[in-house]
């Protein structure tokens, strides 16, 4: 347990940010999963793809995902979408 006041604050802030990032990652994974399901079923594919790419871009902007990871995931979703058409 930290003794210095600033170190105590850092622990609190890190715990809060970790919780927030966990929630955002979970929502991102759900959005990607819904996009993949939409591609398989063929219903609302463009809407699901748009939502997934938007979520990936936001996650990359907020440093939840690395920008290259977000780009790779978007590319793979686009490839799957084009293959399904």
Curated annotation (Swiss-Prot):
Gene Ontology cellular component terms for the protein in this record: cytosol; small ribosomal subunit
UniProt keyword Isomerase present: no
InterPro entries tied to this protein: Ribosomal_bS20, Ribosomal_bS20_sf
GO process annotations (BP): translation
Disulfide bridges in this chain: none
UniProt keyword Signal, yes or no: no
Assigned keywords, A-Z: Ribonucleoprotein, Ribosomal protein, RNA-binding, rRNA-binding
Annotated GO MF terms: small ribosomal subunit rRNA binding; structural constituent of ribosome
One Pfam family linked to the record: Ribosomal_S20p
HAMAP family recorded: Ribosomal_bS20
Family: Belongs to the bacterial ribosomal protein bS20 family.
Function summary: Binds directly to 16S ribosomal RNA.
Protein name: Small ribosomal subunit protein bS20
Source organism per UniProt: Ruminiclostridium cellulolyticum (strain ATCC 35319 / DSM 5812 / JCM 6584 / H10)
Lineage of source species: Bacteria, Bacillati, Bacillota, Clostridia, Eubacteriales
The encoding gene: rpsT
């Amino acid at each position: 347990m930290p003794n210095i006041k600033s170190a105590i604050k850092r622990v609190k802030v890190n715990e809060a940010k970790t919780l927030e990032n966990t929630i955002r990652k979970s929502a991102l994974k759900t959005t990607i999963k819904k996009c993949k399901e939409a591609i398989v079923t063929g219903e609302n594919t463009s809407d699901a793809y748009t939502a997934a790419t938007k979520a990936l871009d936001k996650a990359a902007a907020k440093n939840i995902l690395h920008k290259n990871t977000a780009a790779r995931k978007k590319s793979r979703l686009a490839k799957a979408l084009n293959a399904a058409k």
